[in-house]
């Protein structure tokens, strides 16, 4: 198991703990028991949205309830909770993104990451884009929406670890 590799570094005090990211529907008592044994400190969930309509349309494979249950378990186990969100997913609106941010706060997130939705070739989202069923946010909209949810997090004491993605090849601009 990969988590074993870093244990000597933790024992020597060179590393404090481990941060990892996973899907909300992967979290269970058994998984959390294992992660606790391996000195995991922070678990980030790729929630992306807390609107079931958006999650279904994007075929995320998890529901808002999955995020709620996983978040509750993570906090109950004493882990730091990170919840990642995306702005501009199919059927998203600025209001829905703000509601997702407020829900992330109410779930007790310690930190978050805000990502604008980007179209990557050979994905379901790219198919939707090419069919005309999805229109990505403009740069201006992505900045505005990200700023709005950022304010919600900062005013609520939730640490924002990142806004946006590193540029990379293969993205389709909107």
Give a label for each model feature.
Residues 1-114, 121-140:
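Conserved non-cysteine loop/helix-boundary elements of the Radical SAM core domain that shape
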């Amino acid at each position: 198991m990969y988590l074993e590799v870093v244990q000597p570094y933790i024992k020597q005090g060179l590393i404090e703990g481990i941060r990892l990211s996973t899907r909300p529907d992967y979290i269970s008592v058994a998984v959390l028991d294992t992660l606790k044994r391996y000195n995991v400190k922070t678990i980030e969930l790729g929630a992306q949205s807390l609107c079931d309509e958006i999650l279904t349309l994007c075929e995320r494979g998890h529901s808002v309830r999955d995020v709620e249950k996983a978040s509750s378990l993570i906090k109950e186990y004493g882990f730091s909770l990170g919840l990642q969100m995306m702005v501009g997913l199919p059927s998203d609106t600025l209001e829905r993104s703000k509601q997702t941010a407020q829900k992330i706060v109410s779930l007790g997130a310690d930190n978050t990451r805000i990502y604008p939705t980007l179209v990557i070739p050979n994905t379901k989202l790219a198919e939707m884009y090419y069919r005309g069923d999805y229109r990505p946010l403009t740069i201006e909209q992505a900045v505005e929406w990200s700023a709005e949810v950022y304010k919600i997090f900062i005013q609520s004491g939730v640490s924002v670890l990142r806004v946006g993605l590193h540029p990379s090849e293969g993205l389709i601009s909107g």
